[in-house]
Amino acid sequence: MINYNNIVFDLGNVLVHLDMEGYLNALAGLGLTEYLDAKLHPESRQLMHKLGLGLISTSEFCNEVRSMSGLNITNKQIVDATNKMLGEIPDVKKEALLKLKAQGKRLFLLSNTIDMHWDYCVKELFPYKGYQVDDFFENIFLSQRMYLDKPHPMIFQEVVRQTGIAANDTLFIDDLEANCQAAHQSVGWHVYQNKHFDDWLQLLV
């Protein structure tokens, strides 16, 4: 049972299953592993960070990838490969969101994401029994639209500024400890670190 009236959800590894193996296989298929695997190529991490902060567009990202790799590949190929990171949002989680809303909970989404991932989620992953993404959440906060990302304190402060949610009545669910700590320290939210993909569902029991 969740006793908080405001619940702020992360996206990846909380609602959306992340398929890193599928992503790396897609990169390998295009010959991009050494360029877009952040573990192998530090520039890739910087490029994705700029994309996640809204500092470059998807087209600019694709141009950078072609420049780095020297490969003759299309924007669509790059976008499709990047979106292979996204698995599914299980129906049980969509049902859980709808149940929480029906109980009068105020639901919010706060995600470090990128436009191509978000577009895919909106079109392919969130639709359910006639519901669209805006039916699940009162407000949606995305790093690339806010020009801020977690765990920077200002992103949490901006959510509070826009929503007016009270710290003592707010639960933040995120898979990363650093984000949970920052949310608690900067705005006083109660936090739950979702260490395994389905863990937060036990809060509903």
Model-derived regions: residue spans:
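Asp-based, Mg2+/Mn2+-dependent phosphohydrolase catalytic module
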Residues: 1-4, 9, 114-115, 122-205
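Generic structural signal for small/hydrophobic residues in well-ordered secondary structure
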Residues: 10-13, 54, 100, 109, ...
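Short amphipathic alpha-helical segments and helix-helix/interface helices
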Residues: 24, 94-98, 109, 156, ...
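A generic secondary-structure signal
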Residues: 68, 96-99, 158, 162
